[in-house]
Protein backbone atom coordinates (compact mmCIF):
# COMPACT_ATOMS: atom_id res chain seq x y z
CA UNK A 1 0.00 0.00 0.00
CA UNK A 2 1.14 3.59 0.65
CA UNK A 3 3.00 2.42 3.75
CA UNK A 4 6.75 2.19 3.85
CA UNK A 5 7.79 -1.46 3.73
CA UNK A 6 10.18 -2.41 6.51
CA UNK A 7 11.56 -5.90 7.02
CA UNK A 8 9.35 -7.25 9.83
CA UNK A 9 11.29 -9.36 12.28
CA UNK A 10 8.19 -11.27 13.39
Curated annotation (Swiss-Prot):
<keyword id="KW-0408">Iron</keyword>
<keyword id="KW-0479">Metal-binding</keyword>
<keyword id="KW-0560">Oxidoreductase</keyword>
<dbReference type="GO" id="GO:0046872">
    <property type="term" value="F:metal ion binding"/>
</dbReference>
<protein>
    <recommendedName>
        <fullName>L-ascorbate peroxidase, cytosolic</fullName>
        <ecNumber>1.11.1.11</ecNumber>
    </recommendedName>
</protein>
<dbReference type="GO" id="GO:0042744">
    <property type="term" value="P:hydrogen peroxide catabolic process"/>
</dbReference>
<keyword id="KW-0575">Peroxidase</keyword>
<comment type="similarity">
    <text>Belongs to the peroxidase family. Ascorbate peroxidase subfamily.</text>
</comment>
<dbReference type="GO" id="GO:0016688">
    <property type="term" value="F:L-ascorbate peroxidase activity"/>
</dbReference>
<keyword id="KW-0106">Calcium</keyword>
<keyword id="KW-0630">Potassium</keyword>
<dbReference type="GO" id="GO:0005737">
    <property type="term" value="C:cytoplasm"/>
</dbReference>
<keyword id="KW-0349">Heme</keyword>
<comment type="function">
    <text>Plays a key role in hydrogen peroxide removal.</text>
</comment>
<keyword id="KW-0963">Cytoplasm</keyword>
<keyword id="KW-0376">Hydrogen peroxide</keyword>
Amino acid sequence: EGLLQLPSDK
